[in-house]
Design a protein with these regions (language model features):
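Alpha-helical elements of Rossmann-like donor-binding domains used by nucleotide-donor carbohydrate transfer enzymes
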Residues: 22-29, 42, 70-74, 90, ...
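Active-site neighborhood of HAD-like aspartate-dependent phosphohydrolases
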Residues: 1-45, 76-78
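Substrate-recognition element of Asp-dependent hydrolases with the DxDx(T/V) motif
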Residues: 85-134, 142-145
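Hydrophobic alpha-helical core bundles mediating ligand binding, dimerization, or RNAP-core interactions
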Residues: 23-27, 43-47, 68, 91-95, ...
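Asp-based, Mg2+/Mn2+-dependent phosphohydrolase catalytic module
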Residues: 2-6, 109, 123-239
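Tryptophan-centric aromatic hotspots in well-structured domains and transmembrane helices
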Residues: 19, 98-101, 139, 215
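A metal-dependent, Asp-based hydrolase signature
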Residues: 35-41, 45-89
Length: 239
């Protein structure tokens, strides 16, 4: 059996919070007649390409708030919307107001009794702090790509968590709903927990997944994850 993880580091967008549903609702409220689902999908589609520019060095270090704003302006132009600056700023900060999944808070509070919980997100620190306040997320520490000046899946992000807590990489478990994130963490020696989020991309959109047995644990939601982890290491966890 692997050693009990001491630190659970969580991906946030899609794993902890429902970005698609939250953004869709904000768009529909701000831009009457707009298809919120389609807008959310288009906005998110620019996320990885924008980070790739930073990771490649084509673009200097740029926090996610600023990347989101750049993509937002492009999506608004492409979809024929001329919002004033105030409304653009309000909509861009919708990423600070994302709603948690229904199981998130209960599962996290259960896990918090046994593990140290932190974020490992590409979101910037201010965004993650505001989101935690808005959604009531009980983090012990907020860590971000901004801390390491590297975006996931750069190894510096995963190994950075172990360095911050002064533990071995194997004592950190990444919790995520994205297999590529988990695979990159595993290469760095972290343990991995896959959590299914079938509605992440919106209604009617399903993603195919590979063999989940390659991960340390695979769970249906955060409550299931808490049960699996506490059952796997019943004598090693503090009471």
């Amino acid at each position: 059996m692997k050693p009990a993880p001491l630190i659970l580091a969580f991906d946030v967008f899609g794993t902890v919070v429902d970005w698609h549903g939250s953004i869709s609702r904000e768009v529909a409220a701000l831009i009457p007649g707009e298809d919120g689902d389609a807008f959310a999908t288009a906005w998110r589609a620019g996320y990885k390409p924008a980070m790739a520019e930073v990771r490649s060095g084509k673009l200097g270090w740029t926090k996610i708030d600023d990347l989101h704003r750049r993509i937002l302006d492009q999506v608004l132009l492409a979809r024929g919307h001329d919002l004033d600056e105030s409304r653009r700023q309000h909509l861009n900060r919708a990423w600070h107001r994302l709603a948690p999944w229904p199981d998130t808070l209960q599962g996290m509070h259960h896990l918090k009794h046994h593990f140290t919980l932190c974020t490992l997100s590409n979101g910037n620190l201010g965004l993650l702090a505001n989101m935690a306040k808005h959604a009531g997320l009980p983090w012990d520490l907020i860590l971000s790509a901004e801390v390491f000046r590297h975006y996931k899946p750069d190894p510096q992000t995963y190994l950075g968590v172990a360095e911050v807590f002064d533990v071995k990489p194997a004592q950190v478990m990444l919790v995520a709903s994205h297999e590529d994130d988990l695979d990159a963490a595993a290469v760095c020696g972290l343990q991995t927990a896959y959590v299914a989020r079938p509605m992440e991309l919106g209604p009617g959109v399903r993603t195919q997944h590979g063999d989940l047995s390659r991960f340390t644990v695979a769970a249906q939601d955060f409550n299931d994850l808490a049960d699996r982890l506490t059952n796997a290491w019943p004598t090693q966890l503090p009471t």
